[in-house]
């Protein structure tokens, strides 16, 4: 029984590791939904004033989406790899197609949160009703065979989202709210459909154009995840041991806890890596092959003696697709 449970946990671990991008996007979407709900309850207050309603409603949908989009670009490691590539290599090894695909990957990942925000805002309809209530045609409104009063129609319609109108206009207010919420939710569902189609077509195009088999792509993704995890863990240990050695040289001793003593005893650090080595393993990476053997990352390429030491020029390798 214990062996079966352990096997199931191992399977789930491998599954989630292979689907880390999908899970990350899902968590981003859920976080955005929660933030949108909190914003609607705490911060959203329609001014209910002509001209201001429109600006406030658009800002409530567009400004948070723009901020989330910029944050998504900033938090994406590919962004800074591309910046490093432009700084150190001037993208001399990147053709137009891989560069376009890499930018699409960065923008696509960054668009998850803003698209989710926009969809939830449209499905809720509050911002849309606030923005467009004053633009409803008064002549199209009827309630109990009564027509909407034409005097000060724009001002009256602009106050509908706040429900501050006389009771005799409550039926008109419900009709305006129902009509605008219908339009808002329709746009929200259309946006969901368009995004779903684009994601499907992008995945199909990616796998169709890829020269790698599905299994090798999965292996490549697992390798990148494992390499990044091990690199970060090792860099943390290396920097800690190096810092302890330098502090010891300055003071003559260093105050260490038991875990730090074990780290220094097990992982002696003799020196640091020069800047050219860091530059060699940093930047945009395309899948490459050297003499028929795959190179799965810049670190893999450097470890094989093909980068940073003049052993072989970059054009010996074959760029196939962006990681």
Curated annotation (Swiss-Prot):
Keywords: Cell membrane, Disulfide bond, Ion channel, Ion transport, Membrane, Transmembrane, Transmembrane helix, Transport. It is a multi-pass membrane protein. Its main location: membrane. Residues 44-52, 133-179 are extracellular. Placenta. It is found in: Cell membrane. Signal peptide: none annotated. Residues 214-251 are annotated as: Intersubunit interaction. Changing residue 10 to A: Markedly reduces the inhibition by ruthenium red at negative membrane potentials. Does not affect Ca(2+)-dependent inactivation of the channel. Residues 14-39 are annotated as: Central pore. Residues 145-152 are annotated as: Hemichannel docking. It holds the Pfam family Ca_hom_mod. GO terms for cellular component: plasma membrane. Inhibited by Ca(2+) and ruthenium red in a voltage-dependent way. The record marks 168 as: Not N-glycosylated. Changing residue 251 to A: Decreases intrasubunit interactions. It catalyses: ATP(in) = ATP(out). Residues 1-21, 77-101, 207-323 are cytoplasmic. Changing residue 37 to R: Reduces the inhibition by ruthenium red. GO terms for biological process: ATP export; calcium ion import; positive regulation of apoptotic process; regulation of microglial cell activation; regulation of synaptic plasticity. The chain crosses the membrane at residues 22-43, 53-76, 102-132, 180-206. Disulfide bonds join 46-130, 48-162. Homo-undecamer. Two undecameric hemichannels can assemble in a head-to-head manner to form a gap junction. Pore-forming subunit of Ca(2+) homeostasis modulator channels. Mediates ATP release from astrocytes and ATP-induced Ca(2+) influx in microglia thus regulating neuronal ATP and Ca(2+) homeostasis, synaptic transmission and neuroinflammatory response. May form intercellular gap junctions. The gating mechanism remains unknown. Belongs to the CALHM family. This is Calcium homeostasis modulator protein 2. It comes from Homo sapiens (Human). The gene is CALHM2.
